[in-house]
Amino acid sequence: MREPDQGVPIRMPSPHDSGAVNALLADPVFAALAEEAARDYIDWDELAKRPLPAGLSATDTWQLLTAVRRFGSTQFPIRDMRGRVYWYTLTRESSLCVDAIERHCRADSATHRAILHRHGRRFLVGSRIREAIAACQLDGVVVSPDEAESLLMSGRAPRNATDRLILNSHALLYELDDLADEPFSPELLTRLYERLIEGVDLSALERRPVRHGLTDRVESAPVTPEARAGVIQQFCAYANGETGDPTESVAIKAHALLNTAQHWEFFPDFNGIVGRCIFRLFAAQRDYPVLGYLPISSLYQSWSEGRMESSVVRFSSLDTGRSSSETEVDYTPNVLTYLQISVVALDELLGSIARARRRDAEVRSRLEHDAELNYRQRSIIAHALANPDVELRIREHQTAHNVVYATARADLLDLVDCGYLRQELRGRAFVFLPDPDLPERLGGAEEA
């Protein structure tokens, strides 16, 4: 099937064409296509499999369906480098995603309470580590995930420029909460960038090509500093709610801000990492903290590498060329993909909370005689049961539960005193190992 022609305007009917227009709208084939396109979005490949209205080519039908959907669309207030307008419609699939995000990501949600009270803490720590690593990788920095995770969990000092960048990226995710009451401004964005590159020898980083959002970058003429500064002002107005549709979903707007920062390259480098910080900060400002906790960058990465099933994310790839013209871009499939990736991340979080609750309940039932053990210690015991060869360290426990060093040390030493762990010297530091008799002592308990 031939590709749709790009940039071909649809001829507007004259009064003499009204009969033909009415006949088309009454045509059952076109009416069914228009209804489905408005509710669910029909992409070009799907249209190729459908019967077409009599007398219309596939390209004609595509353009007419786009025109019908355009009437009910939402438009982003910031154009791209080629001056094109971006718009989208909220499909039924998108609406379901927005509903899930509304229910679970707000500050007053049960999910947020679970994170604050403990059951989501381990996920939250792991999510921030994944985000710091994935955001650096998407911005073209060569990173060993295992080495980076070890760096962030151990608390050791950075040894090179890559270590420093990862530490800065990770630290920024924690520091953003302090900025939640500050409106977006060019100065705020500059502070985020300067904090990110603080102490980093940029010339020493090993780099790969940068990926921008879900689609490949479209080349355009160089942007002047004046034009970029103007876009940054528009960006801040949009982020602060001064422009744009006031009813727009927080999740959609957060993704739009992230991708605008990447597309316009606000800074000389690392616009993806800065964009991710903007995403999280905007979510916090709008009282959607859980949205900001989700490991969006790492799941973007999984999607782009083809590691997501079509049952959870509809589109395996995106080509905006099929839905764009010289003046505008239909961004509907991109918005749906962003929302579905967010829901995948949300499902991971909910699963992690459910597993933590089951583990906690099981270990609590096995430790009725040790009622004084706290939830962190029960978490250690559950982890030790599932991983009998694990080596536990104070710094890693401190990072995993966001406690001070003295508390983490006391947790582990108490478990040694109770006989659940044993302590051994490794070099100049102690590690903690599960007692060999731990499963028998707890009656064969296993991780849920």
Locations of regions flagged by a protein language model:
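Residues that form generic nucleotide/phosphate-binding pockets
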Residues: 23-24, 36, 50, 67, ...
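Phosphate/pyrophosphate-binding active-site loops
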Residues: 2-76, 217-351
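Exposed alpha-helical structural elements
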Residues: 20, 60-63, 89-107, 119, ...
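Generic structural signal for alpha-helix starts
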Residues: 39, 90-91, 249, 374
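C-terminal regulatory or interaction extensions
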Residues: 258-266, 275-448
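Active-site core of Fic-domain adenylyltransferases
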Residues: 87, 104-268, 276-293
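Eukaryote-specific, low-hydrophobicity, charge-rich regions
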Residues: 54-121, 126, 130
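Residue-level marker of regulatory loop/turn positions in helix-turn-helix DNA-binding domains and
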Residues: 121, 271, 373
